[in-house]
Regions:
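Conserved small/polar residues in nucleotide/adenosyl-binding loops
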Residues: 150-155
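Alpha-solenoid helical repeat scaffolds
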Residues: 95, 134-135
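Core helices of alpha-solenoid repeat scaffolds
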Residues: 109-117
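Hydrophobic residues within the alpha-helices of tandem HEAT/HEAT-like
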Residues: 100, 139-146
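HEAT-repeat alpha-solenoid elements in large eukaryotic scaffold proteins
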Residues: 2, 17-24, 71-76, 85-102
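Extended, helix-rich scaffolding/adaptor regions
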Residues: 1-52
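HEAT/HEAT-like alpha-solenoid repeats
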Residues: 118-126, 156
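Acidic, Ser/Thr- and Gly/Pro-rich intrinsically disordered linkers and low-complexity segments
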Residues: 60-84
Length: 156
């Protein structure tokens, strides 16, 4: 059930676009997002429209995390140190964190605490994988920004 005025078919299409991009992230990560202008425009536009529906964001992140844990046979988000994570799994985590970075204010606190932060932890502790470290760091900074917006008074 949508929690915004974005029609459900649009939400479904945008969700599928992000899921397809998840499958080809290993290619775009090799060349960088700057090498694919159309990809970047579609990626950030899909994230922007989906961010208007918190339930759609939560469902997509939950599905992506479930696939990550199931596909790579991981028992918990932070079950392995970064040095022992295979490249495919690391790419999957990095893409998920890129998505989450844009939506931290839309996701429930329990998801952040039980899933997102544990996914970030191995890459914040072991900084040898630059893309993953940057994604994890960006998520943490986005969390701080989100918290600041909720707790700091607005200047008037």
């Amino acid at each position: 059930m949508p929690t915004s005025n974005v029609p459900a078919p649009y939400l479904a299409i945008l969700t599928q676009i992000l899921r397809v991009f998840e499958r080809v992230y290993f290619i775009t990560s090799t060349f960088g997002l700057d090498g694919f202008e159309s990809y970047r425009v579609v990626f950030y536009s899909a994230l922007d429209v989906l961010s208007r529906d918190a339930e759609a964001c939560t469902q997509l992140v939950s599905a992506m995390a479930h696939d990550l844990l199931e596909r790579h046979g991981v028992s918990a988000p932070d079950a392995q140190p970064a040095a022992h994570v295979r490249m495919g799994q690391r790419m999957h985590v990095t893409y998920l964190l890129l998505v989450v970075e844009q939506w931290v204010s839309e996701l429930p606190d329990t998801m952040i605490n039980q899933l997102i932060l544990p996914l970030c932890r191995p890459y914040l502790q072991d900084t040898r994988f630059q893309d993953s470290v940057e994604s994890a760091h960006s998520v943490v900074l986005a969390l701080y920004t989100s918290c600041l917006l909720y707790t700091a008074p607005s200047p008037r």
